[in-house]
Amino acid sequence: MKEIGFQFTIEAPDIDESFSPHMDVHLVPTFLAKNKARVFANKINSEVVIASDTVVILNNKILNKPIDRLDAISMLTELSGKTHLVITAVCLYSKTKMEVFDDRTEVTFKNLTRKEIEFFIDTCKPLDKAGAYGAQDCLTPGVNPCSHEEIDFLNSINKSDLIEKSLRGSQAGLGITIIQEINGSYFTVMGLPIHKVYSHLMNF
């Protein structure tokens, strides 16, 4: 957010992230983003809260963060050779109003061997990530993963180098290319669709 011109502080609210088993999985991130934002109802004055939640969905099932290495292997084996959906929902919240939106991106994995999966897990340590992967660690070196919409947005604010900055400290380029294609927003898969957040904030 700082890179696109907004000053902010980060707080991680302690909320119950459970939801009804009957809830449409595509609505879960919106439900959780709203709950995260409401935690700050009595803590803000003129500030705007930006709360978000990201889910990875395969075959109408949400893949959470793996509980251990074996669980991560199981998740990546399940994702191998398939296309899954990543949804990031964002809630903008102030004393006077609330606005919620989401962005949806399809991610296709290459066919992966057990050896490749284990190498990825041991190198990238993805146990803290939904679906057991972080997009920034899985990209083909030299390939811009952003959508045309994102590229146009970054160029319009003179931040075309933001892609490279997002990859610093990642494992991209170490031969761990497990993503075949991203159809939609790269930053949505990263956890925040910055082009949409910017647009909504400017009109909030």
Q: Over which residues does each language-model region extend?
A:
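Short, conserved active-site loops that position catalytic residues or coordinate cofactors/metal ions
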Residues: 10-15, 51-54
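Anionic-ligand binding patches
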Residues: 24-204
